[in-house]
Amino acid sequence: MTLEEIKMMIREIPDFPKKGIKFKDITPVLKDAKAFNYSIEMLAKALEGRKFDLIAAPEARGFLFGAPLAYRLGVGFVPVRKPGKLPAETLSYEYELEYGTDSLEIHKDAVLEGQRVVIVDDLLATGGTIYASAKLVESLGGIVDSIIFLTELTFLDGRKKLDGYDIISLIKF
């Protein structure tokens, strides 16, 4: 298995979730045990040598890679969720979308002062969701060690939004 083979498995769905969008669908990678395992192993390899305490990931697709990666690396996992989905006291961060705003939440006790956190998501597009996730980690006193993605849509320039963070992406479109 290679990253090029993983890239070829990611299919493009036209006009989803709305007209004009070419959605990158990772579900073929997820359903193929060898491809999914290889993806997690390559994400883990990209983080070799780094010292961090936690992996945080935004819902929903960030969970698909963040939780197994945390398990593989023997660190804790912190879910970053949409409003009203976490049961304990939360901190919220509102961010801009193409049409309006959205927000994400994190438990107030999820990250301790000085803990180093890697943020994981399936795909870097505009960077808004991950930027909000990073700001939530930092608001709790955490240090964003790096941000890692399986895939990146380079034409959307999401890295600009994340300027100043160490960004890793394995597959670029």
Swiss-Prot record:
It is found in: Cytoplasm. Keywords: Cytoplasm, Glycosyltransferase, Purine salvage, Transferase. Pathway: Purine metabolism; AMP biosynthesis via salvage pathway; AMP from adenine: step 1/1. InterPro entries: Ade_phspho_trans, PRibTrfase_dom, PRTase-like, UPRTase/APRTase. GO terms for molecular function: adenine binding; adenine phosphoribosyltransferase activity; AMP binding. Gene3D superfamilies: 3.40.50.2020. CDD domains: PRTases_typeI. The keyword Glycosyltransferase applies. It holds the Pfam family Pribosyltran. Its EC number is 2.4.2.7. It catalyses: AMP + diphosphate = 5-phospho-alpha-D-ribose 1-diphosphate + adenine. GO terms for cellular component: cytoplasm. It is an enzyme of class 2 (transferase). Its main location: cytoplasm. GO terms for biological process: adenine salvage; AMP salvage; purine ribonucleoside salvage. It comes from the Bacteria. Belongs to the purine/pyrimidine phosphoribosyltransferase family. PANTHER family: ADENINE PHOSPHORIBOSYLTRANSFERASE. NCBIfam families: apt (TIGR01090), PRK02304.1-2 (NF002633), PRK02304.1-3 (NF002634), PRK02304.1-5 (NF002636). Homodimer. Catalyzes a salvage reaction resulting in the formation of AMP, that is energically less costly than de novo synthesis. This is Adenine phosphoribosyltransferase.
